[in-house]
Amino acid sequence: MTEDSQRNFRSVYYEKVGFRGVEEKKSLEILLKDDRLDIEKLCTFSQRFPLPSMYRALVWKVLLGILPPHHESHVQVMTYRKEQYSDVLHALKVIRFVSDATPQSEVYLYMHRLESGKLPRSPSFPLEPEDEVFLAIAKAMEEMVEDSVDCYWIMRCFVNQLNSKYRDTLPQLPKAFEQYLNLEDSRLLSHLKACCAVSTLPYELWFKKCFAGCLPESSLQRIWDKVVSGSCKILVFVAVEILLTFKIKVMALNSAEKITKFLENIPQDSSDAIVSKAIDLWHKHCGTPVHSA
């Protein structure tokens, strides 16, 4: 049996006995052993497979540019990142903008605002819409990333990616959602249109907050793997799958207000299945990236 056929046999066997991720984890470990990490291959892997939790923070930091591809620089670069984190936090404490009682997500927000040159005159100033988005993402990220320095940098770069790389794409996602829902279930879309609900769907929750506050973090991180590695279009298919999963409930609601309220507070127990099906839908419509380790 050749090495490739042995690998394929093992993959099929592992999948049958419930250890689908074993081969994928080995492939990722091979990629992470390279002296110079291959960003393109890491992106492809992240697009195709869920990242193992033990490697997620590292891969995200590399893909978001927090760490350079070269392994030997990682310790030194993270030392600089920690120093910068401490300096910004100290500055906020000196000007009494934050204290030990300030919720961590708000601390991250004010740090981000200070570094962006957009710190308000007082923490009592009302939040901007973009601040609400940041806080939602921050609260979710806190649950995913234990280390506060890692958490801040990943969150900051994740939000910056949404505001720069995806700036022109995100406003187009509601239209794409309508298009793909029509392909998957035209009757469901017709019902939404009949209720005048299409324009009132929770697009900000879905496409600006990337489902933070909508889905539990265990499901959310599998979606964000795809966003971090280059595809915000996965968000469209998560939204479509939510509608397909709760079709019976949505079809029974007869007003835009009721439909939107339900979709903003969907039951959490189906989240893992929704994300798995959404990823399958995404691959079905957009193709599966070819992975080479």
UniProtKB/Swiss-Prot annotation:
It is found in: Lysosome membrane; Cytoplasmic vesicle; Cytoplasm, Cytosol. One of its GO terms (cellular component) is cytosol. Gene3D superfamilies: Ypt/Rab-GAP domain of gyp1p, domain 1, Ypt/Rab-GAP domain of gyp1p, domain 2, Ypt/Rab-GAP domain of gyp1p, domain 3. This is TBC1 domain family member 7. Non-catalytic component of the TSC-TBC complex, a multiprotein complex that acts as a negative regulator of the canonical mTORC1 complex, an evolutionarily conserved central nutrient sensor that stimulates anabolic reactions and macromolecule biosynthesis to promote cellular biomass generation and growth. The TSC-TBC complex acts as a GTPase-activating protein (GAP) for the small GTPase RHEB, a direct activator of the protein kinase activity of mTORC1. It comes from Bos taurus. Keywords: Cytoplasm, Cytoplasmic vesicle, GTPase activation, Lysosome, Membrane. Residues 50-231 form the Rab-GAP TBC domain. PROSITE patterns: TBC_RABGAP (PS50086). GO terms for molecular function: GTPase activator activity; TSC1-TSC2 complex binding. Component of the TSC-TBC complex (also named Rhebulator complex), composed of 2 molecules of TSC1, 2 molecules of TSC2 and 1 molecule of TBC1D7. Interacts with TSC1 (via C-terminal half of the coiled-coil domain). The gene is TBC1D7. It holds the Pfam family RabGAP-TBC. GO terms for biological process: activation of GTPase activity; cellular response to starvation; negative regulation of TOR signaling; negative regulation of TORC1 signaling; positive regulation of protein ubiquitination; response to growth factor.
